[in-house]
Amino acid sequence: MSLIPASISTAIADRAKILGTLETLVLGAAGGLLFLWANLPGGLISGAMVAVGIAALAGRPLHMPPILTQTVLVLLGITLGSLVSRQLIQHMSAYPLTIGLLALATFCMTFGSSFYLQRFHRWDPTSALLAASPGALSQITILAAEKGADVPAIAVVQTMRVIILTAALPLVLALTGIAPSAPPVFASVVASPLELAALIAAAIAVALLLRLAKFPASWMFGAMIASSVLHGTALIEGGLPPWMRGVALVGIGAVIGTRFARIRKSTLLSHVNAGLGSFAVAIIISAIFVAVILLTTNVRFADVVVAFAPGAMDAMLALALTLHIDPIFVGAHHLSRFVFVSITTPGIIHLFGRPQEDVDD
């Protein structure tokens, strides 16, 4: 008798998740198509993110299961890899200098934003440093829980930074003429069914290998590497059908938007000023380093802006796809920052965070 209520509650929970997933997909598609119809730059990803984010803040039980998120990341990686060309690879000579400056910029952004949060919002040093660290959100969240930091406040600041960048960056770049507002023109050749199957199989295989090796963003980068090799060696010439590329962009936007579903409205409102202020500090510091790179290298302005933007790796690569921006350059820099943040943040917290015992000790 006791098994019946348990089975019913499980079925209800599963049904709620399915309905939440369907609602997320419908809202994301509607928002993306609306922004695309309005000819807004980065319309599919920005529209999906805004629509899902607003619904999540309104209390809708939105949900994106891991299998759908992984599928979206694989499709995005395949599309990014198909854009790789010899001309883009030739620009890699500038990477050591720009990646070195990115590491320094990350260090300055972390301490600059942390100082702002401590000075003007009275945050404790540990929470401020973790909230100010750009990228590697999963590692930051785990470390915050271990150190007894204010996890909800950190989540608000980190999420706001990603949301603002993803929504505003395409619009700013387009309005200033730095990046085109029109959707990117992809190769008109679509891979044959056999090529498409081989492309997807190779993408999943490499992604699984990277996942076993604990490589960050393994689904997206694995697919990107496989696609780059197959297209770069001319083994496959065609790419994904347009509708698949659209699904990838809408999916990424929906995934970002669902982050608000995990944040209470009261928590968001209580930390919105901290999020906006720390974001402004990070952008000012990033702009200084972007200016230095523009004066010392021949890298395009738009490429540097997106590569140095303190946003999520998957979101920034999706923007690179929609704004005609070098995916290799952006990917290399965001991956480098991910590694830098993951390696250095525990040491920074140990040296500069509040002195206390770990929660799990």
Model-derived regions: residue spans:
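Transmembrane alpha-helix boundary signature
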Residues: P61-M64, S82-Y95, F111-D124, A291, ...
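Alpha-helical membrane segments and immediately flanking helix-loop junctions
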Residues: L117-M160, V299-H333
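Intrinsically disordered, low-complexity non-transmembrane regions of multi-pass membrane transporters
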Residues: M1-V26, L137-Q139, D150-A153, I178-P193, ...
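Membrane-interface helix termini and inter-helical loops of multi-pass transporters
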Residues: R86-A94, L175-A191, T233-P242, S266, ...
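C-terminal ends of transmembrane helices
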Residues: G53-M64, F111-W123, T141-E146, A153, ...
